[in-house]
Amino acid sequence: MFVMHTAELVIATLRTHEAELRQSGLRSLSLFGSVARGETETDSDIDLAAEFDPAARMDLLKLTALERRIAELLGSPVDLLPEPVEKRRLQDQINRDRLRAF
């Protein structure tokens, strides 16, 4: 199910749940992509860039579980990308669009 979101609503929701999300090892979480740019379509997912505490030892299972939890909180599909991103072009887009939640 896709729900139309504004950047302000996404960031406010993430900030409301910041303590819970930080317990998963998140150091910072930023919105980027179409929602951040205000170009949301009815089928837009929510693109998030995450920096993790190295002590959290994130693996694919933990990352997937966190992505699902954030999608549940936001009521929309989420694409959660750990930073730094290897593809320079994608990292440039993240940096250009970035709206920091925390």
Where are these regions (language model features)?
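Catalytic core of pol beta-like nucleotidyltransferases
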Residues: M1-S28, A36-T42, D53-F102
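A structural signal for short, well-ordered beta-strand segments
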Residues: L31, L48-A50
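A short, structured beta-strand/loop element
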Residues: T42-L48
